[in-house]
UniProtKB/Swiss-Prot annotation:
Family the UniProt entry places it in: Belongs to the TRAFAC class OBG-HflX-like GTPase superfamily. OBG GTPase family. YchF/OLA1 subfamily.
Residues the entry annotates as binding ATP: 12-17
Nucleus as UniProt keyword: no
Cofactor dependency: Mg(2+)
The name this protein goes by in its record: Ribosome-binding ATPase YchF
Domain TGS: 278-361
GO cellular component, one term: cytoplasm
Record-listed Mg(2+) binding positions: 16, 36
Classification via CDD domains: TGS_YchF_OLA1 (cd04867), YchF (cd01900)
């Protein structure tokens, strides 16, 4: 699995249209609030041209991309943290995701109602962020009450956790984001179990009309806000994505060329998600399968091996490694070996994006 991204936004911003396009799940995308009731989940293959290039050389029995999971959360409204709209249940669903994709409406269309009666991306973002902060505030206050008793009895872990929660409490009281608080590695690890919503990496998916990727004041405003937060912005046109999703691969290429677009918005969303979560891809390439795997940037070879199977990490001996560019240039493993580009790496090796790897292990 690549990662799980919860798609949030106000009702009628294009959330479900985008989700349908990304996953071809075909859930209802009606023009009225709350048409998403249970969270819909879709697993999407990660588009990566490198995988096809490797497969052309190796000619395997099958090709397996890595994947990304999208969860379409019902449209949030002001008061969701207090049970308004469809309430707390949906905030709980977001907690289970690794990142948040916040869909923001950056287009005008009189036929599609806006829940607030006007198009104002800054206001929309504030509404959602406030609800997420209020939900975190509730969790934080309850955790503080629980921890105070343990901290008084001398529990060191409880004292440490309490000190972190007391640091983030005033930020949440002002509807701020926990991710704006400077927390070190140990502090982040200590509060990981709370799954705080405002700590999750966030990207803004700006839903625009097909002719308003440029010179769009709504999009400019989202970019301005995202820059202040250190968040990523991905402009897409959900309506175009919905059309692309219905086409065969060859038709897609022609359709994109006609529109002057290089690739579907899905690719941009996934790449942004990868950057957001500090992820990268490595490959395994054999006659049975050529496959992409997702690991964290900075992962060691044994950690990369564990993605395939935990036994690979436990019994790790060495990793055979060829850089992707070398594998392509020298037409596979044998050519790379002859060119001196095949190498053996130990347990401290830091995996690089695109590495073609084979693990030696003994259990």
């Amino acid at each position: 699995m690549g990662f799980k991204c919860g798609i949030v936004g106000l009702p009628n911003v294009g959330k479900s249209t985008l989700f349908n396009a990304l996953t071809k799940a075909g859930i209802e995308a009606a023009n009225y609030p709350f048409c998403t009731i249970e969270p819909n989940t879709g697993v999407v293959p990660m588009p990566d041209p490198r995988l096809d290039a490797l497969a052309e050389i190796v000619n395997p029995e099958r090709v397996l991309p890595t994947t990304m999971e999208f969860v379409d959360i019902a449209g949030l409204v002001a008061g969701a943290s207090k049970g308004e709209g469809l309430g707390n249940k949906f905030l709980a669903n977001i907690r289970e995701t690794d990142a948040i994709g916040h869909v923001v409406r950056c287009f005008e269309n009189d036929d599609i109602v806006h829940v607030a009666g006007k198009i104002d991306p800054a206001d929309d973002i504030e509404t959602i962020n406030t609800e997420l902060a209020l939900a975190d505030l509730d969790s934080c206050e309850r955790a503080i009450q629980r921890l105070q008793k343990r901290a008084k009895s001398g529990d060191k872990d409880a004292k440490f956790e309490l000190s972190i929660l007391e640091k983030i409490l005033p930020v949440l009281e002002n509807a701020g984001m926990i991710r704006s608080v400077a927390l070190d590695k140990d502090e982040l690890h200590a509060i990981k179990g709370y799954n705080f919503l405002t700590l999750k990496p966030t990207m803004y998916i700006a839903n625009v009309n097909e002719d308003s990727f440029e010179n769009n004041p709504y999009l400019d405003r989202v970019r301005q806000l995202a820059e202040q937060e250190g968040a990523v912005v991905v402009p897409v046109c959900a309506a175009i994505e919905a059309e692309i999703a219905e086409l065969e691969d060859e038709e897609k290429v022609d359709f994109l060329q006609d529109l002057g677009i290089e690739e579907p918005g899905l690719n941009r969303v996934i790449r942004a998600g990868y950057r957001l979560l500090n992820l990268q891809t490595y490959f395994t390439a054999g006659v049975k399968e050529v496959r992409a795997w997702t690991v964290a940037v900075g992962a060691t070879a044994p950690k990369a091996a564990a993605v395939i199977h935990t036994d690979f990490e436990k019994g790790f001996i060495r990793a055979e490694v060829i850089a992707y560019d070398d594998f392509i240039q020298f037409k596979g493993e044998n050519g790379a070996k002859e060119a001196g580009k095949w190498r053996l790496e130990g347990k401290d090796y830091i995996v690089q994006d695109g590495d073609v790897m084979h693990f030696r292990f003994n259990v």
